[in-house]
């Protein structure tokens, strides 16, 4: 999912897990929840398009990578806190230092939330790198979902002091979210806009009536996470039914060996786009493309060139086109590009 969702869910999660034991738990949760993406800066990103396809959601998002990030962040933050305590103690000042176990538990929860939230969508997750590069997809929740912004933000605001500083922060983030949601009204389902508005009204009432405050902020965060769990679980149940329907349609269309997927739709929770494929064709309900994967030039591109190999390992539904000269091959993932020669999910390979 997007980094704002990771940040807000991570903040709420670490507050729910360790707020009584770790100072600034929400702030640390923001950092920890984005550690898998931030770590990519140390392994070659940003880079070329091929670098992105290979490295994004790569080793830093694997289970091994998560263990390294959890240990590294715990040591970095824990030791930093203790150094700060030692420095301040020389001036007769004190600072609360969290216990190692609670710090590690909160950071682990936030880091692992990133992996799970990426897994629940249609982009995919590779948990077993560096040994196995297989992608896994739950196809439950879209890569961008406004409720994964709004629900944790409301909980964090409810748990804050009634002061203009935290209120201003919540209003800036909430206002930005609202701007993008309303701007995309043609993409976002009407019921989502209605529920979004209702939640905003409830958020304002809860803040002014002090339903939660600093004393109850851990409960507020836990409540928000419970709401997201129920929301995600409901989508998982509906997705299961939709997947069975799509699988049956794929087998009727292309036989028992057909591949298929139920792709999440941004802005339209509880709906999925059908995609079906055989070895020669990839199609949806109202479109169809030849894959051309057996063409000699395509085989050469995906086995002997770096860009081609990058797209081949990434694409869930790989398709290709060879230009009329036979010297250039266009490769794309039909989830995100369908016959186009431009876009982030398209790779152009020139054969020498």
Each predicted region: which residue ranges?
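Extracytosolic and intramembrane catalytic regions of membrane-associated proteins
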Residues: 251-352
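N-terminal membrane-targeting hydrophobic helices
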Residues: 1-232, 236-241, 246, 250-253
